[in-house]
Amino acid sequence: MDHRTPTPDNPWLALRNLTPARIALGRTGTSLPTGAQLDFQFAHAQARDAVHLAFDHAGLASQLSDRGRESLVLHSAASDRHQYLQRPDLGRRLNEDSIATLRQHAQANPGGVDLAIVVADGLSALAVHRHTLPFLTRFDEQAAADGWTCAPVVLVQQGRVAVADEVGELLGARMTVMLIGERPGLSSPDSLGLYFTYAPKVGLTDAYRNCISNIRLEGLSYGMAAHRLLYLMREACRRQLSGVNLKDEAEVHSLENEDSANQKGNFLLGKG
């Protein structure tokens, strides 16, 4: 504090460089500084916009096609955004036209597949637009050697997490992966969530799903998310289950892990 800035120094200020969280905002009297208040209002507006942003399924389907991936565009039983937000149950099921489309595809491609990837707007189409393709690129790179068979990428408008169960059941998929926009936060309007289910069928609860959340540049990297998903897929097939009975114990190779492995004794007591 000096004569030019007559406010006390904030010892938390240096921590702002380490996180996008709203910490060390400062104060003016008993209130927030104007800048911090405006930033809050802007972040809140971004979160609201993310919820109501329309899902550009046509653009995403075109980008997938450019990368050699087939896609199917479907719709949940929620007719529009207003109904989707007020009736979560309708977002968990497909409409009749979409069910017919999947049945026709399954009849034309009998035998089922290992994996059905479903993409839905959820509560942030912005997250889906930004992160779906980069994640799938990294996933394909890491999964190439495993020989998984995949259904076309299914794009569901006004979809919620559980709609992937119906998609997987109709396609005869052993596993489903749902990529969906998470509820926006004040510092993360574009967070992508991933939900993995083994033996999908209508009526499963969240206890049968594994979640990998906050996939974005400022959160969990695409490569790490793909690494964890592949671990879950391998373990789910080996143990024939998913959800609360399947823990994410994927090994992550890093400098910190290597240092820990090489260090002997208790780190609290120093090197032995």
Curated annotation (Swiss-Prot):
Details of cofactor binding: Binds between the large and small subunits.
Named cofactor requirement(s): adenosylcob(III)alamin
Binding site for adenosylcob(III)alamin: 161, 182, 211
Gene it is expressed from: eutC
Record bears the keyword Lyase: yes
Cell location: Bacterial microcompartment
Protein's name in the database: Ethanolamine ammonia-lyase small subunit
A Pfam family that the UniProt record links to this protein: EutC
Superkingdom of origin: Bacteria
Organism expressing this protein natively: Pseudomonas putida (strain ATCC 47054 / DSM 6125 / CFBP 8728 / NCIMB 11950 / KT2440)
Summary of the function given for this chain in its UniProt record: Catalyzes the deamination of various vicinal amino-alcohols to oxo compounds. Allows this organism to utilize ethanolamine as the sole source of nitrogen and carbon in the presence of external vitamin B12.
EC number: 4.3.1.7
Any GO BP annotation: amino acid metabolic process
Alphabetized GO MF terms: cobalamin binding; ethanolamine ammonia-lyase activity
Alphabetized UniProt keyword annotations: Bacterial microcompartment, Cobalamin, Cobalt, Lyase
UniProt keyword Transmembrane helix present: no
Subunit-level organization: The basic unit is a heterodimer which dimerizes to form tetramers. The heterotetramers trimerize; 6 large subunits form a core ring with 6 small subunits projecting outwards.
The protein's enzyme class: lyase
Record field: catalytic activity: ethanolamine = acetaldehyde + NH4(+)
Pathway(s) annotated for this protein in UniProt: Amine and polyamine degradation; ethanolamine degradation
Family label: Belongs to the EutC family.
Gene Ontology CC annotations of this record: ethanolamine ammonia-lyase complex; ethanolamine degradation polyhedral organelle
PANTHER family in alphabetical order: ETHANOLAMINE AMMONIA-LYASE LIGHT CHAIN, ETHANOLAMINE AMMONIA-LYASE SMALL SUBUNIT
